[in-house]
């Protein structure tokens, strides 16, 4: 009778260890998936960007270098942009269809912009927006 109790106790402990190791492995995998966005981040649908080669297939966010995506892809710092409605980027930005402009070599195939002529808080804007911003930020300098 005593050996059966020890056997059941041993099996219970082994089962508890098995469950806890499964939980620990799952948490470790989730942590690794969260930190994967630093380099070569992104995903298939609504994939977020990343530091280098970030982006995704659909609605992919941009990234620092080579960011962007296939559809509605956000821009990026260098070589940013995307295929359809792709946002621009700092250098070589733009996209194929309705591609947004960029700082250098910006533009796209259809409806794409070009280099910005007017900047408003670090982004391209129209001449009217730039003039309105200039009027609101102009200050009278005191004469000494």
Swiss-Prot record:
Organism lineage: Eukaryota, Viridiplantae, Streptophyta, Embryophyta, Tracheophyta
Q: Which domain of life is it from?
A: Eukaryota
Record protein name field: Glycine-rich protein DC9.1
Q: Where are the sequence repeats?
A: 37-42, 43-48, 50-55, 56-61, 63-68, 69-74, 76-81, 82-87, 89-94, 102-107, 108-113
The answer, when asked if Lyase is one of the entry's keywords, is: no
**Membrane topology per record:** Single-pass membrane protein
Question: Where does it reside?
Answer: Membrane
Keyword Signal among UniProt keywords: no
- Renumbered residue ranges of the record's region 11 X 6 AA tandem repeats of G-Y-[NH]-N-G -G: 37-113
Query: One Pfam family from the UniProt entry?
Result: GRP
Give the similarity note: Belongs to the GRP family.
Extract one GO cellular component term from the record: membrane
Predominant subcellular localization, coarse grouping = membrane
Q: Which residues cross the membrane?
A: 5-25
